[in-house]
A protein has these predicted regions:
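Acidic/polar loop-and-plug regions of large Gram-negative outer-membrane beta-barrel proteins
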Residues: 297-355, 378-459, 523-547, 721-724
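Gram-negative outer-membrane beta-barrel transporters
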Residues: 570, 711-714, 735-873, 977
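Transmembrane beta-barrel wall of Gram-negative outer-membrane proteins
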Residues: 24, 236-269, 273-312, 344-363, ...
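Membrane-embedded beta-barrel scaffold of Gram-negative outer-membrane proteins
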Residues: 365-369, 656, 660, 670, ...
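Structural signature of Gram-negative outer-membrane beta-barrels, strongest in the C-terminal barrel
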Residues: 465-467, 477-485, 489-500, 505-506, ...
Length: 980
C-alpha cells in the first residue's frame, strides 16, 4: 500500500511538472515589407542574459520553442543580409505564444552611402529644392531597386515632392517646420547610428503616426538599436567627396540593462566632376540607454553634423557649350591662385533626444519622446551695391547678349559677340577670370573705393531654428484580432531668418541700404534703409562690419499639435484598418527690424513721418503694411483619414487597397508674399486638400517576388510664392499663386526571379506615371518696393496650352487657319507636367551572391518623360501677348510650351566581398560603378528664368534661356570596412 502511494505521488508530481512546461513560443521570420519568409535565420532564446536555446528558421521562415516554463524571455533574430532584431516575449499559463510574424529589414549594399547626399541640392533660390522621396526603401521587390538605384536621376516617388514624405526620429515628426521638406541633412554621415528604421510606402500607416500619402519612415536612433560591436570604414566617392572616414561602436543591451553607442565620421575633399564643390563635414553621435526592468526603459542621445560644403550652380546651355562641359560651375573663381567658392553652406544643428518606453505587458506598450533641435544653417552668396554683377555667367557677359541670328531679338553686334565667345572658349590663365569669379578684382574695387567702403561683399543667409518637440504613442492589443494604436505630437518652432556679413572682401564696411529701393526712391533717403530705426536715431545708414546682421531679420513662429489613432482588425488572413488625425497649425511672422519701405506705425500707433514725408504705407485693401512686429496669426484645422483593406492567401499572395483624404495647412514659406520685407500674407490662404488611393497585388514564394500597384492622387488648393525681376515692369516683383491643383496617377511593377544558377536572380521594375497640373491658378503680382498690386488674374496657360491648326508654311513661317469669324482654330491642348522627375522609369538588374560572400550586380536603367520646372510669368497673357498686347498662335505656342528632357539610358554595376576571421572579425569591401557608359548629357532638373526679351518691333517677347543641372559622368564608390 505504501509503495502504491509513493508511485501515485511520483506520477502526480511528474504530471504537475509536465503541465508547468507546456508553454512555448512560435512565429515566422519574414521580410518587413512583402512578408517574404526568411529561411536560415538564427533565433536565440535568452532569459536574464543567459542563452537557453537556438533554432534555425525553416524554408517557410517558421521556428518553435516548446516546453518552456512561464516567464519573460528575449528573442534575438539574426540573418545574413538582414538587420537583426530583439523582442521581449512573456510565456504564461502554460500556453504556446504565437507571435505570428517577426519582421526584419534587409541590409542593402548601398547603405554605406548617405541618402542625404542626394537630398542636399543647395538650390533654394532657384525654385528647385525638392529631395528624392524614396531614398528610405522598404525593401520589397520594387523599392529595393528604385529606393537607391534611381537616386542619381533624382527620382521622385510617384512624382511627389519631398514635403509629402513623413520622416520621424525616435517617434518624433522631423519634417522641416518652415518648408515641410524631409530633413536628411540633419543626420548626414551617421549611417550606423541611423540604420535601424521602419518604413512604409504610399498610404500605409505606421506605429508612429498615420502619415500621408507618400510613406512614413521612423529612424530608431536609440543606442540599443545601433548594431552591436565595432565598425570602421573608409569610403571614396568620385561624384561626391574624396574621402569618408567612419567609426562606430555599440555595446548592445548589457546584462545590467545599460547600453552605449557612438558614431563618428568625416567627409572631406572634392570630386572628379564639378570644380569648386567640396565637403568638409563632420558628424558625431553619442547615446546611452538604461532598461530598469521589463517595463521601463530610458534612452538619451545627441548628435550633430557640423561642417561646410561648396555648392554647384545651374547655368544655361549656352554657357555649358562655351565651356565644353555640362559640369561647369559658375560659383567659383581663383583668389591668389587658389579655388574659392562663393556658395558655401555652413551647418551646425545639434539635436538632443530623450525617449521613455513603457511595456507593462505583451499586449500594451507606449513611448514618450522629447526632442530639441538648435544651431544654425546658412549659405553664402555674393552681394553688391553700386557695382557690376560679378557672376561670370551673367547674361550680359555672354555672346548671345550681343548677337543673335534672329533679327527680331535686336542683338546685332557681331564683333562684341565674337570677342565674348573667344574669351569664353580660351583655356589659358589669361581668360580664367572671364570664365570664373574674379575674386582679385572684387578685392581691388573695394580697396580703392573711398573709405574702403565695400561695393562687393559675401553675405551669409542664415536660418537659425529653435525647435522643441514632444511625441507620445501607444500600441494596445485589445483582443487577438483587434489592435488600437494612437498618439499625439506637438511642436514649438522659433526660426530666425537674417543675413550675416560673412566677408567684406578687403573693405572696411558695407552700407545697410536696399539697392533696389535706392534706384526707385533715391530722393527719399529714409525709404532705402534696411534698418529705419537706426537711421532715425543716428542720421545715417548703418555701416555693417564683418559678423553683423543686415538686410533683413525676422522670426518665423510655428505652433503645431496633432492627435492620431489607428484601429486594426485581423482575422484569417483578412486585415482592415481605419486611421485618422486631428490637428491645429498656427504660424506668424515677427519682424525684428523696421524697413524704410514698410515703416508701419510707431509705438503709439501713429504714422511715421520723416522730413515732412509720410513713410507709413497701405496695401490695396487699406491695411497698414508693416515690416517690424507681429503679423496676423494664421490658424488652420488639419485632419486626415485612411482606410486600408488587405487579404493574404496561402501560397504567398496578398491583395490590398488603401485610400486616404488629407486636409493640410500651407507651409510658412508659401504663405507670406515677401517674408524678407514685410508681414503681408497671401490673400485667401487655404488648406491643401488631397485624395489618394492605391491598389496592390504582391506575391512572395520560393524566391519569386512580384508587386503590382496602381495609384491615383488628386491635390487641390496649393500655394506658391516667388520673387523675381520683371522686365515688363522694370522692377523686382513678388508673385503669389493660389489654387494650384495637380493629378498624379500611375502604375508600379516589380518582379524578381531566381535563375538557373544558385544565387543568381533577375529583377525588373517599371514606374509609369502621369503627373499633371489640372487648374489655372489665380495669381497676384506686387511690386516688391511698394507692395503695389500690378496684376491680379488667372494664369491662363498653366495647366496646358493650345496647339493651333496650321493652314500653310510659307518660307518656313507657319500660317494658322481661322474660322469664319476670324478666330484661330485650336486643334488640341498640350498638358503641362510636374517637373524634375522622370514619369517613365524602368530598370533591369542581375544579382549574383555566392556562399562565400561574394556579390555581383549589373543593372540597366531607362528614364523618360521628365520636364523642366515652369515659371508662371511665361503662361500669362502679358508674356504671350507681347508689347502690343495681341496674342498670336505662334507667341502662345512658343511662350507657354514646357520643355521635355531627352530620354536617358544608364548602366551601373557593383562587386563586393566579405571575409570572416575566426568567426569574430569581418573585413569586406564594395565597389560600385555608376553611369558606366559615361553619359554626360542627362538633365536631372533645372528651371526657367523669369526674364523677358523685347522684340525689335516691341510687339512680342522672347524668353531667356533656361538653366539646367546635369548628372555627372562615370563615377565610382569604393567602401572598405572592418567590424567585430
Amino acid at each position: 500500500m505504501k509503495r502504491t502511494l509513493l508511485i501515485l505521488a511520483a506520477f502526480l508530481t511528474l504530471c504537475a511538472s509536465a503541465s508547468a512546461y507546456d508553454g512555448g513560443i512560435k512565429a515566422s521570420v519574414v521580410n518587413r515589407t512583402g512578408r517574404a519568409p526568411v529561411a536560415g535565420a538564427l533565433v536565440s532564446l535568452i532569459q536574464d542574459g543567459e542563452l537557453l536555446r537556438t533554432a534555425t528558421t525553416a524554408p517557410d521562415g517558421s521556428f518553435c520553442f516548446e516546453d518552456l516554463p512561464d516567464g519573460k524571455y528575449n528573442l534575438s533574430v539574426e540573418a545574413s543580409d538582414f538587420i537583426g532584431t530583439t523582442i521581449n516575449v512573456t510565456v504564461e499559463k502554460g500556453l504556446m505564444r504565437d507571435l505570428m510574424f517577426v519582421t526584419i529589414s534587409r541590409v542593402r549594399v548601398g547603405e554605406d552611402i548617405d541618402a542625404s547626399n542626394f537630398a542636399e541640392f543647395d538650390l533654394e533660390d532657384s525654385g528647385y529644392s525638392d529631395a528624392p522621396t524614396i531614398l528610405f526603401s522598404t525593401n520589397d521587390v520594387y523599392t529595393d531597386v528604385v529606393g537607391y538605384g534611381f537616386s542619381n536621376i533624382r527620382f521622385k516617388n510617384r512624382g511627389y515632392n519631398s514635403e509629402t514624405q513623413d520622416v520621424y526620429l525616435a517617434g518624433v515628426p522631423m519634417n522641416d517646420a518652415i518648408t515641410g521638406y524631409s530633413p536628411f541633412s540633419l543626420w548626414s554621415g551617421l549611417n550606423e547610428a541611423m540604420r535601424a528604421k521602419d518604413s512604409t510606402l504610399g498610404l500605409e500607416s505606421s506605429d508612429f503616426g498615420v502619415g500621408g500619402y507618400n510613406g512614413v519612415t521612423n529612424i530608431s536612433a536609440i543606442p540599443s538599436a545601433v548594431r552591436t560591436g565595432w565598425r570602421f570604414s573608409i569610403l571614396s566617392n568620385s561624384a561626391l567627396y574624396r574621402l569618408r572616414l567612419m567609426a562606430s561602436y555599440s555595446s548592445g543591451e548589457l546584462d545590467n540593462g545599460w547600453s552605449y553607442a557612438f558614431n563618428a565620421s568625416a567627409r572631406l575633399g572634392g570630386n572628379d566632376w564639378v570644380e569648386g564643390v567640396y565637403y568638409r563635414n563632420f558628424a558625431l553621435y553619442a547615446g546611452v540607454g538604461k532598461r530598469f526592468n521589463d517595463e521601463h526603459k530610458l534612452s538619451l542621445f545627441a548628435f550633430a553634423t557640423p561642417g561646410q560644403r561648396g555648392a554647384q550652380n545651374a547655368s544655361t546651355q549656352e554657357v555649358y557649350d562655351l565651356m565644353g562641359d555640362n559640369m561647369y560651375n559658375s560659383n567659383w573663381g581663383y583668389q591668389n591662385g587658389k579655388v574659392r567658392n562663393s556658395r558655401v553652406r555652413h551647418t551646425f544643428e545639434p539635436i538632443v533626444t530623450l525617449k521613455y518606453e513603457y511595456t507593462p505587458s505583451d499586449e500594451f506598450n507606449a513611448y514618450a519622446t522629447v526632442l530639441f533641435r538648435g544651431g544654425y544653417n546658412g549659405y553664402t552668396a555674393l552681394d553688391w551695391y553700386d557695382a557690376q554683377d560679378p557672376r561670370p555667367d551673367y547674361y550680359r557677359n555672354l555672346p548671345s547678349y550681343f548677337y543673335m541670328e534672329e533679327d527680331d531679338y535686336n542683338r546685332v553686334n557681331f564683333e562684341k559677340a565674337a570677342w565674348a565667345e573667344y574669351a569664353w572658349t580660351q583655356r589659358t590663365p589669361a581668360y580664367a577670370n572671364y570664365q570664373h569669379i574674379n575674386w582679385d578684382r572684387l578685392y581691388n574695387v573695394n580697396y580703392n573705393n573711398p573709405e574702403r567702403r565695400s561695393k562687393y561683399a559675401l553675405e551669409e543667409r542664415r536660418v537659425d531654428q529653435r525647435d522643441l518637440n514632444f511625441a507620445a504613442a501607444f500600441n494596445y492589443l485589445a483582443t487577438p484580432r483587434f489592435t488600437l494604436k494612437g498618439g499625439l505630437d506637438a511642436k514649438i518652432n522659433r526660426t530666425e531668418n537674417y543675413k550675416l556679413m560673412n566677408d567684406l572682401l578687403g573693405g572696411n564696411y558695407y552700407l545697410n541700404i536696399d539697392s533696389f529701393a535706392e534706384r526707385d526712391f533715391a530722393s527719399n533717403e529714409a525709404l532705402v534703409q534696411n534698418d529705419l530705426d537706426y537711421f532715425l536715431a543716428n542720421g545715417s545708414a548703418e555701416k555693417i562690419m564683418q559678423g553683423r546682421k543686415y538686410g533683413y531679420d525676422y522670426l518665423a513662429q510655428i505652433r503645431r499639435a496633432n492627435l492620431w489613432a489607428n484601429g486594426i482588425y485581423s482575422k484569417d488572413g483578412f486585415t482592415a484598418s481605419l486611421a485618422g488625425t486631428l490637428g491645429v497649425d498656427s504660424f506668424w511672422r515677427e519682424g525684428l527690424v523696421r524697413k524704410g519701405l514698410f515703416a508701419g506705425l510707431d509705438d503709439n500707433g501713429n504714422e511715421i513721418v520723416y522730413e515732412g514725408r509720410t513713410l507709413t504705407s497701405y496695401d490695396h485693401k487699406g491695411r497698414v503694411i508693416t515690416s517690424k512686429g507681429k503679423s496676423e496669426v494664421s490658424t488652420f484645422l488639419t485632419w486626415s483619414t485612411k482606410l486600408a483593406l488587405a487579404y493574404e492567401m496561402t501560397g504567398g499572395h496578398r491583395f490590398s487597397v488603401n485610400a486616404g483624404y488629407f486636409n493640410d495647412a500651407p507651409t510658412f514659406n508659401q504663405s507670406f508674399i515677401s517674408a524678407r520685407t514685410r508681414n503681408s500674407l497671401v490673400d485667401n490662404l487655404q488648406t491643401v486638400k488631397t485624395l489618394s488611393a492605391d491598389v496592390n497585388y504582391q506575391y512572395n514564394n520560393n524566391g519569386y517576388s512580384l508587386r503590382v500597384t496602381g495609384f491615383y492622387t488628386g491635390i487641390k488648393d496649393q500655394t506658391d510664392v516667388m520673387s523675381f525681376y520683371d522686365d515688363s515692369q522694370q522692377s523686382f516683383t513678388n508673385f503669389a499663386m493660389t489654387g494650384i491643383d495637380q493629378r498624379h496617377l500611375g502604375l508600379e511593377l516589380g518582379v524578381k526571379v531566381p535563375l538557373f544558377v544558385q544565387g543568381l536572380t533577375a529583377s525588373a521594375v517599371l514606374s509609369w506615371g502621369e503627373y499633371v497640373y489640372t487648374s489655372n491658378p489665380e495669381m497676384v503680382q506686387t511690386v516688391d518696393n511698394s507692395a503695389e498690386v500690378i496684376r491680379s488674374e488667372s494664369v491662363p496657360y498653366w495647366k496646358s496650352h493650345p496647339v493651333y491648326k496650321v493652314a500653310a508654311v510659307v518660307d518656313g513661317v507657319k500660317v494658322y487657319d481661322q474660322d469664319a469669324d476670324g478666330n484661330y482654330i485650336v486643334e488640341g491642348e498640350v498638358k503641362h507636367y510636374g517637373p524634375s522627375t522622370p514619369q517613365l522609369a524602368t530598370a533591369f538588374q542581375l544579382n549574383y551572391r555566392t556562399n562565400d560572400y561574394w556579390f555581383f550586380e549589373l543593372g540597366a536603367q531607362f528614364f523618360a518623360n521628365s520636364y523642366l520646372d515652369m515659371n508662371p510669368l511665361y503662361r500669362t497673357h502679358l508674356a504671350c501677348g507681347g508689347g502690343d498686347g495681341i496674342e498670336t498662335p505662334s507667341e502662345v505656342e512658343y511662350m507657354a510650351a514646357q520643355e521635355k528632357f531627352d530620354p536617358a539610358f544608364l548602366l551601373n554595376g557593383s562587386i563586393g566581398k566579405s571575409w570572416q576571421i575566426n568567426r569574430t572579425y569581418t573585413i569586406g569591401f564594395s565597389l560600385e560603378a555608376s553611369n558606366m557608359l559615361n553619359n554626360r548629357n542627362v538633365k536631372t532638373g533645372g528651371y526657367e528664368q523669369t526674364r523677358l526679351i523685347s522684340s525689335y518691333g516691341k510687339d512680342r517677347y522672347y524668353r531667356f534661356d533656361p538653366k539646367y543641372f546635369y548628372m555627372s559622368g562615370a563615377s565610382y564608390m569604393l567602401n572598405i570596412y572592418f567590424r567585430f
